[in-house]
């Protein structure tokens, strides 16, 4: 894991072993409220079904990661967000695909999140993270968040 800088912001980059398939680019929202973090459970019938993750999705061609995240949150949660700084980036290879995932600090700006394209939503505290199962691509981020209490406000 190493530090990178982008527009004056520092964030961590974690890279795991790459396999020989094209990376799927993903943007994910870190939405904190009242010392809790929003997570969503992946629906049945999709890759990594039943695991908990951070809301977001695949970036479309020509779309910025920030625009992708705003679109995905409207589609998945029926609410609006402001996308803030990049917090963490990870490239992780699964047997069937590689994901290049970027996690952004976000704020709710319109509506209340609803589980539209996921099985469930939860607001969890830092101490509850271990009670949920997350995809391997999120583990390095979770370790980083454990060391960053200032984000949980």
What are these regions (language model features)?
Residues 16-37, 58:
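Conserved N-terminal beta-strand and adjoining loop/helix that marks the start
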Residues 105, 114-145:
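NUDIX/MutT-family hydrolases
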Residues 11-12:
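Aromatic (phenylalanine/tyrosine) cluster motif
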Residues 80, 89-112, 122, 145:
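Active-site-adjacent beta-strand/loop module that shapes the phosphate/pyrophosphate-binding cleft
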Residues 46-50:
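A conserved beta-turn-beta hairpin within the catalytic core of GNAT-like acetyltransferases
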Residues 54-86, 125:
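The catalytic Nudix box helix
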